[in-house]
Regions:
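Solvent-exposed, low-complexity, repeat-rich "mucin-like" stalks and linkers
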Residues: 4-17, 68-100, 157-159, 167-191, ...
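Short linear proline/tyrosine/threonine-rich motifs used for host-factor recruitment
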Residues: 79, 163-165, 294-298
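Serine/threonine-rich, repeat-prone extracellular segments and beta-strand-based repeat modules
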Residues: 34-58, 110-140, 203-222, 256-296, ...
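Extracellular/surface recognition and adhesion modules
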Residues: 1, 28, 66-68, 104, ...
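Surface-exposed or flexible loop/turn and strand-edge residues in extracellular/cell-surface modules
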Residues: 18-21, 55, 63, 77, ...
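Extended non-catalytic domains of envelope/secretory-pathway proteins
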Residues: 8-34, 51, 59-61, 86-102, ...
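Short domain-boundary/entry signatures in modular proteins, especially
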Residues: 57-67, 141-151, 225-232, 300-310
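Serine/threonine-rich low-complexity intrinsically disordered regions
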Residues: 1-6, 36, 51, 58-64, ...
């Protein structure tokens, strides 16, 4: 006996047959027999009318349980005992117990078969227990990490914070793993390196925080990496009225981190009658990256049209020329000559 206790019940009969006796249901235990069957009474010994006592034994064994295993520690959790059949001490009864849900995990029986949710639309309500095949044997419930998936998209942001999605070919939609595991970053870093080669600076990268897969297998995680395009700068190019700026001067006027600069000479402006026109520009195309992974930037170089020789730089009377009034002769066409509008007084420091 499980309890190591023996109890006795009177078994009486007014005739020559012992009547059958039902076995009581003991909650939490399974009996080895449902009843004590009727049996013929033994013949009394001579010189006595007393029928000898008859003894029979019923053994109770502790009923089995479903035992959920903690997925984080691997230790057995609180057992969930099988139900007793109220009418048969040798059987288990109607199953109403529920196996608890754990976020990010799927419960499975001893054969590795996933349990059926009580409500498929809401697994958080729990799962139906595995079928009982032996009322005295425990059934372990293991929890396996769910398969998870993550996606990454890339957007370009401007100085005002406005986001523009990059070509979808740079997005990543096949990052997979298990609940709680670190999301693999190899593909993400490779994509970031490509965008850097295309002249983008990373503004915000959530993968710097080593994110992990969440516990919601029905919903893919989504991450957004923000990048900002590098911008080239240009200084003015001076040309004599009627001439066009050379490609080399235009390229030299552009400061960039790009790997190539090109000029479409068919797009160079006509400078005739354009002296003093501050809207005149010439486009220079800057290329970042190469092949299928390249970005082109159009840099509009200011074109300053000047008259023929000599060049005049006005200054205030009795002032040395100011820095902002000075010129770089290298910016002008070869052979240009320069004079002051008025001869400055170099004995008095300028402002």
């Amino acid at each position: 006996l499980v309890t190591k206790e023996v109890s006795y019940t009177d078994w009486e009969s007014p005739n020559k047959t012992w009547d059958k006796v039902g076995v009581d249901v003991l909650p939490g235990y399974i009996a080895d027999k449902k009843e004590i069957p009727a049996k013929e009474a033994a013949t009394p010994a001579k010189d006595t009318k007393v029928i000898p006592d008859e003894t029979d034994k019923v053994t109770y064994t502790k009923i089995g349980s479903w035992i959920p295993v903690d997925p984080t520690t691997g230790k057995d959790g609180d057992p969930i005992p099988f139900p007793n059949d109220p009418n048969d001490p040798t059987k288990t009864g109607e199953v109403t117990q529920i196996i608890p849900h754990k976020d990010g995990y799927t419960p499975k029986d001893g054969n590795g078969t996933p349990l059926e949710p009580v409500n498929p639309a809401n697994p958080e309500e729990g799962y139906k227990p595995p079928k009982i095949t032996d009322p005295k044997a425990n059934i372990k419930i293991t929890y396996d990490k769910d398969d998870q998936k993550a996606k990454v998209k890339f957007v370009s942001v401007d100085d005002e914070g406005v986001e523009t999605p990059l070509d979808t070919k740079y997005n990543i939609d096949d990052l997979t793993g298990k609940s709680g595991d670190k999301i693999p970053e190899e593909k993400v870093q490779a994509r970031v390196d490509v965008l850097k080669s295309m002249g983008y600076d990373v503004v915000d990268n959530p993968f710097d925080q080593d994110p992990t897969f969440d516990t919601k297998k029905e919903i893919d995680q989504e991450f957004t990496i923000k990048v900002k395009p590098q911008v080239s700068t240009a200084k003015p190019v001076y040309v004599v009225e009627g001439d066009k700026p050379s490609s080399e001067k235009l390229k030299d006027a552009v400061t960039t981190k790009g790997n190539e600069k090109t000029v479409d000479e068919t797009k160079l402006p006509d400078t005739t009658d354009k002296v003093g026109d501050d809207t005149l520009t010439a486009p220079v195309t800057v290329t970042y990256g190469s092949g299928d992974n390249k970005r082109e930037e159009t840099v509009n170089v200011p074109i300053k049209v000047v008259e023929g020789y000599p060049q005049i730089v006005p200054v205030d009377p009795k002032e040395a020329p100011k820095a902002e009034d000075s010129i770089n002769p290298d910016d002008y066409p070869a052979g240009s000559k320069f004079t002051y509008e008025k001869e400055p007084d170099t004995t008095t420091p300028g402002d």
